[in-house]
Amino acid sequence: MHAGLLGLSALLQAAEQSARLYTVAYYFTTGRLLWGWLALAVLLPGFLVQALSYLWFRADGHPGHCSLVMLHLLQLGVWKRHWDAALTALQKEPEAPHRGWLQLQEADLSALRLLEALLQTGPHLLLQTYVFLASDFTDIVPGVSTLFSWSSLSWALVSYTRFMGFMKPGHLAMPWAALFCQQLWRMGMLGTRVMSLVLFYKAYHFWVFVVAGAHWLVMTFWLVAQQSDIIDSTCHWRLFNLLVGAVYILCYLSFWDSPSRNRMVTFYMVMLLENTILLLLATDFLQGASWTSLQTIAGVLSGFLIGSVSLVIYYSLLHPKSTDIWQGCLRKSCGIAGGDKTERRASPRATDLAGKRTESSGSCQGASYELTILGKPPTPEQVPPEAGLGTQVAVEDSFLSHHHWLWVKLALKTGNMSKINAAFGDDNPVYCPPAWGLSQQDDLQRKALSAQRELPSSSRHPSTLENSSAFEGVSKAEADPLETSSYVSFASDQQDEAPTQNPAATQGEGTPKEGADAVSGTQGKGTGGQQRGGEGQQSSTLYFSATAEVATSSQQEGSPATLQTAHSGRRLGKSSPAQPASPHPVGLAPFPATMADISPILGTGPCRGFCPSAGFPGRTLSISELEEPLEPTRELSHHAAVGVWMSLPQLRTAHEPCLTSTPKSESIQTDCSCREQMKQEPSFFI
């Protein structure tokens, strides 16, 4: 089917471009120089498309030979992409890398073809439609050119939608009937819109630009109100809204990952109202109804009717998720569903548990270490494990700026990393060029997980816990992959005496005295438990990002779904030998985080960046010392380098470590025991 779609796209493009060139020559040979120069000027925006195609070739690793430059100067760069994609599609039994590369080639081709159609074919369609109507349907050359341009622009929209959907994980094959319905939908809506604008221009001339400008402005503000998260940069986000608002003058494209039923209905209702008003004004129907005016209005609006019927048929019968769409419409019409907002809510159970933990956090006041489980795109294979943080972060930024990463975000209609990681699981890696190695994320994680389990417990010296925490992995046979956003807060409290602990909180730990001594050693106190310097310690906040898997614990039936972390009684800075940690304590599920996937996130405090830890007075840690305990992690996986991001919000008294479910605000006063059981509770964001 790939070869057939590529062949159909090439055939329509060849017919449209041939008709366009013949129309230009026809105008010059017949002495209609104005139309000839206007038709020739429409070709100029095509150089922007060719420039983008050339830059994308270079980004994919193609050498910038003179032949490649000449092809793009002759506006044949898109044709070269057609040729390359056809060669890849016609290979017998292509391997998985070739299939992934074919998807990227088709995505590049469909995006460039859509851009070329909007910049060249759209203006040419409007121009030739006006010339054809001005000649009272007698000039056959502009009429044929109008037909091919109309079909080509509609197919460019269908092809873009199809190939973007093909990049989604778990996609289903789209039958030819679905493509035919989409083509009728696009042609019907485009035909009505183009005829309305051209007829209004014939009657009111340049006032049509006022109408188009007002429509552009309204659509741009509407897009801003919808808050699409595909683009991260503020400047680029504004430019994106302006460009999409210009596209909405003619057609509709969806850029939101939420259900677009209400948006689509709103857009087409506005278009129907606007087209009807333009037709009534253009045909002088308000001054006096005539049979000719009625025929014109009915003929033009019949295209909108055909497009609407095709749209309904496609989404109700031929869409890959037509059953879910139909059931959603029925639930909403019956009042069962509460709308799109209910589909975006977090898990009530997780929210309730997080709320309870926040309310019962007690009087422990101290540093907060937040572990936000989010996905990160892996770094290239070319980056050595000993490379510094700056090098690997630069490589990651280069990956995120690659145009193939933009296709992933456009296909999923979101730029949220957690949503993208939730969509692309272990069995459906993101397809990227071989140089980026994104499809090898599963192998890296599996190797890191297995290597981490092989580490002996004796090698985990307590001194290494000054800058990092060791967590046990979860076996894939015992865990279901599920995208979570979890918060782990390490609060520390300092007390002169060892606090009273309940049995549940002290399971797997040392004695209370040992715990108090450990905290004293951590905070730099003397033997008597007094602080050095007499002043409150500055608290620090570590922010990390990691991927996680939620384990299904069968032994905790009947209890709240709380993932508990194995805590071994080793304390920061403890001088006495630590008890070996049990890999799987009874009743405690292992922490579902892979150390090889942890990467830093900048804190929210006033002092952001790499800085010495304030929790160890009298000693300044260098960057190399901070990264030293994490070197085994880098050896396990060439992931983004893990650093320690510190934010020093205020002076506090240091307290003993305590693990809670949500990050605590620095101003919250609590009254709980400071030796509380370490827990990790997932919060789901869909």
UniProtKB/Swiss-Prot annotation:
Chief localization: membrane
Region described as Disordered: spans on this chain: 340-362, 444-470, 490-589
The keyword Cell membrane belongs to this UniProt entry's keyword annotation: yes
Matches recorded under InterPro entries: XK-rel (IPR018629), XK-related_scramblase (IPR050895)
UniProt biased composition (Polar residues): 455-470, 490-509, 550-567
Membrane topology type: Multi-pass membrane protein
Compositional bias ranges of the Gly residues kind: 523-536
Subcellular location, record wording: Cell membrane
Protein name as annotated: XK-related protein 5
Organism whose genome encodes this protein: Pan troglodytes
Name of the gene encoding the protein in the UniProt record: XKR5
